[in-house]
C-alpha cells in the first residue's frame, strides 16, 4: 500500500504473467490489477497490460484514477447490507459494529481498505478469480445510496434520529 502526492492510496491487487510462444521461445507480458482510493469514500480500479511490470502498474493506476466512484460511508462502515454481482462472482458486504475490523480476503480487502471502511463483514461467493471478485465488490459499493439520495428519490424529508 503506497500513498502518492494527491493523497490517494494505491494497492496492487493482482499481478499476472502471460507467455506467448513464438519461434524464438516465449514472449512474456504482464497485467496488473490496481485499486486506488482516498480513504474517505472514493475508489477506483484499473487493469494495465505491458511488457514490463512497472509499466503495467502505471497504466492500471492511471485507469483507476480516471474511473473513481463515490461510496457513502457511515461511521467507518456501510449504511446497509449489499450484494455485488459480476460474472460468476458474488460479494456480500455487511456492515459491522465498531472494533470488528475488516473481515475480508484478497481483492475485497484491498478495495475496502482504500475506500476507508474500518469495520465490515464480507463473503465472496461463486469464484475466486481476482478480477471478477474485485468488480463484484465495486458493483456492490456503487449500488449503495446515502439516506439523502433515497429521500430525494422518494420525495421524502430525511430526519436524523437524536441520540
Curated annotation (Swiss-Prot):
It comes from the Bacteria. Keywords: Ribonucleoprotein, Ribosomal protein, RNA-binding, rRNA-binding. GO terms for molecular function: rRNA binding; structural constituent of ribosome. Coiled coil: none annotated. The keyword Thylakoid does not apply. Disulfide bonds: none annotated. GO terms for biological process: translation. Pfam families: Ribosomal_S5, Ribosomal_S5_C. SUPFAM superfamilies: dsRNA-binding domain-like (SSF54768), Ribosomal protein S5 domain 2-like (SSF54211). The keyword Ribosomal protein applies. Residues 8-71 form the S5 DRBM domain. Belongs to the universal ribosomal protein uS5 family. This is Small ribosomal subunit protein uS5.
Amino acid at each position: 500500500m503506497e500513498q502518492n502526492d494527491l493523497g490517494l492510496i494505491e494497492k496492487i491487487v493482482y499481478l499476472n504473467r502471460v507467455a506467448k510462444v513464438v519461434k524464438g521461445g516465449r514472449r512474456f507480458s504482464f497485467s496488473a490489477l490496481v485499486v486506488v482510493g482516498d480513504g474517505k469514500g472514493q475508489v477506483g480500479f484499473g487493469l494495465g497490460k505491458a511488457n514490463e511490470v512497472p509499466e503495467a502498474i502505471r497504466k492500471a493506476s492511471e485507469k483507476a484514477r480516471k474511473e473513481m466512484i463515490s461510496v457513502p460511508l457511515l461511521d467507518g462502515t456501510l449504511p446497509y447490507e449489499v450484494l455485488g454481482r459480476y460474472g460468476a462472482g458474488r460479494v456480500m458486504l455487511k456492515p459491522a459494529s465498531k472494533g470488528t475490523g475488516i473481515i475480508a480476503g484478497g481483492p475485497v480487502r484491498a478495495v475496502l481498505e482504500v475506500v476507508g471502511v474500518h469495520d465490515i463483514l464480507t463473503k465472496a461467493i461463486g469464484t475466486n478469480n481476482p478480477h471478477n471478485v474485485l468488480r463484484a465488490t465495486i458493483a456492490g459499493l456503487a449500488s449503495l445510496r446515502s439516506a439523502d439520495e433515497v429521500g430525494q428519490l422518494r420525495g421524502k424529508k430525511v430526519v436524523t434520529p437524536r441520540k
